[in-house]
């Protein structure tokens, strides 16, 4: 698949286009231009390194939404075996913007749950652009309860712009469904390992992200509102999204510094979409390390640790000026 370049990546795109042009010429010519191709390839790689070493929060937001970025089912295919998807909330419908099911990770039975966006127009519409309705969150709750019943660790993958705010979703109890998931996950008697793989949009993300460990991919985001939404409220213009992204502190490094996440998983050069298999290998290692950390822990110790972790959120210290 041809790589889609973002607007700030245009210098890289121009170099890559030149490299492709030279490769085409070399195939149809007896002239050896392999050295020039190699030189330009190294130049492109260095340019990518330099560019990605100094990304703004808004640019990170763009990468997190990249249309070729791996989604939950892509990681399921790479990391898990014997995946059997489970459907429906047993109350209203099956919301396919959240997928989940039984699987094996490194031979260990587990439950996998995650947001799922679409690749083309038809699939995006079917999956509601990764914005779950209440039945999606209730399906997730059902699968979590099932995992608890059989003592299976839960892996959740977060990638959503937010919960769907439609009238029907609100009428069917969107806020109640999200709130219940927060309550359920806080007390589940089984390990929960959460990874933000793309967008972590507000309560829609948090509803499957109350974990014993929360990790983020290097170029993913996690915030209470999108930069555009924040800009529209504060500046009355979505054009101020870059400033809003800066103010929101939505990057993995910022959230790690605040103690809101536990680990950052580095991405391949140019982002996860440039090397999905390489990203999957890095993610596999991080998930295995996290699972190993909790496997020998008693249920009581696990829940106590989770409670203390949640209670540590939002703590601050007041000081007297001049003291």
From Swiss-Prot:
SUPFAM superfamilies: ClpP/crotonase. One of its GO terms (biological process) is fatty acid biosynthetic process. Acetyl-CoA carboxylase is a heterohexamer composed of biotin carboxyl carrier protein (AccB), biotin carboxylase (AccC) and two subunits each of ACCase subunit alpha (AccA) and ACCase subunit beta (AccD). InterPro entries: Acetyl_CoA_COase_a_su, ClpP/crotonase-like_dom_sf, COA_CT_C. It is an enzyme of class 2 (transferase). Residues 39-293 form the CoA carboxyltransferase C-terminal domain. Belongs to the AccA family. It is found in: Cytoplasm. This is Acetyl-coenzyme A carboxylase carboxyl transferase subunit alpha. It comes from the Bacteria. It comes from Burkholderia vietnamiensis (strain G4 / LMG 22486).
